[in-house]
Amino acid sequence: MFRLSFASIAARLAFAGALLASAAAQAASCPVHYLDGRPPEIQNQKLAVSTRELCYGVFGVVHSGVTRTPLWSAEYVRADNLKRAQGLDRDDKFHAESRLPRGQRAELADYARSGFDRGHLAPNANMPDRRTQRESFSLANMVPQDRDHNRKIWAPIEGAVRTMAKKEGELYVITGPAFLGTSRKKVGNVIVPTHLYKVVSSPRQRLGAAWLTENRADAPINVVPVAELERIVGIELLPSLSTKQKERMLRLPTVKPSKKRS
């Protein structure tokens, strides 16, 4: 019979404990941005390769060195911060994220003459002061986004979230790209997402729901349960809610695409 010595068992338990401690430490890096302090959990392990957590003032990012984009950006959106944000003029200072290795991050040159916008995940318009506004212009908070999608579809969705937050007082929001299908398009070294999603959860109602759209100009705006979106993207986005809660739908405003010219 195969037997492990006490020392061997102790060593294995210590190693497992170290792994758990490491995971817990990473999960707790910026818990304030997540519902109940619990960040999303990656189920599709292909997505977990070369990921790093980055904490900012009013949002947090988990960045992929493979796609050179965020996997998600998380915000605790408060009505008082949005009121402060209304008094700020936009100051466009896009920059590469110095905390990321050069071989895993997006550079300004990747987007140059690409025809794609540098699309914010955590919106600049949610930032309450100059410091957080500058943080939002890090390329670690950006994905390559169809220009008309950004202006005509995504901007109205972001506005709807702000309207909700002012009524609710507070919301937790997770915004991310999806890379569905087998073909991959790049701008420079950055992979272009096929879809974008925005999950909104209410701590008061203990419910969430999500907008999901293709990354193209004429994409329909879909509203889906969190449970369905989790299956699509391979990430448990709201791990502190039960399956039943995630199958129910938080009521989201109807969003119509803007007809303004780009």
Label the model's feature ranges.
Residues 2-6, 19-262:
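Domain-level detector for secreted/extracellular nuclease and nuclease-toxin modules, and
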Residues 8-17:
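Sec-dependent N-terminal signal peptides
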